Amino acid sequence: MALTKLGNPEAKADRSLETFPIDDTSQEIRIDCREFTCRCPITGQPDWATIRIDYRPGGRGLETKSLKLYLETFREEGIFHEHLATLIRDDLVAALAPVQLTVTVNFNARGGIALAASSTYRREA
């Protein structure tokens, strides 16, 4: 698969994720996304979060510009925090076919309450 977003100033936000071959499947890879925003599905108010992605590759690595553009698509979307962690996990698993992958979404406090949601995938042996 050719990388079409990296180095392309015309690349637009969409839900496609690009990957590249990676030989060392013993690696543990961590990606922190510190500027995530979406909206409350009830009030429409903005929510801010940090998203952490930890994965052991199954032969594919995640190209991070495509991840950035993917995450931008949620900016105006109303979604419950718990649903977001699972949706991102499912999309990443479909793109990467990893050995293991965990998505943790840490939302900033609202009304004095902070919420974190994690969703994990493990390939069956």
Swiss-Prot record:
Matches recorded under Pfam families: QueF
InterPro entries in the record: GTP-CH-I_C/QueF, NADPH_dep_7-cyano-7-deazaG_red, QueF, QueF_type1
Protein location: Cytoplasm
Oxidoreductase found in the keyword field: yes
Reaction(s) the record says it catalyses: 7-aminomethyl-7-carbaguanine + 2 NADP(+) = 7-cyano-7-deazaguanine + 2 NADPH + 3 H(+)
Listed GO MF terms: preQ1 synthase activity
Keyword Cytoplasm: yes
Listed EC numbers: 1.7.1.13
Annotated catalytic residues: C40, D47
Binding site for substrate: L62, E63, T64, H81, E82
Described function: Catalyzes the NADPH-dependent reduction of 7-cyano-7-deazaguanine (preQ0) to 7-aminomethyl-7-deazaguanine (preQ1).
The family this protein is said to belong to: Belongs to the GTP cyclohydrolase I family. QueF type 1 subfamily.
Name of protein: NADPH-dependent 7-cyano-7-deazaguanine reductase
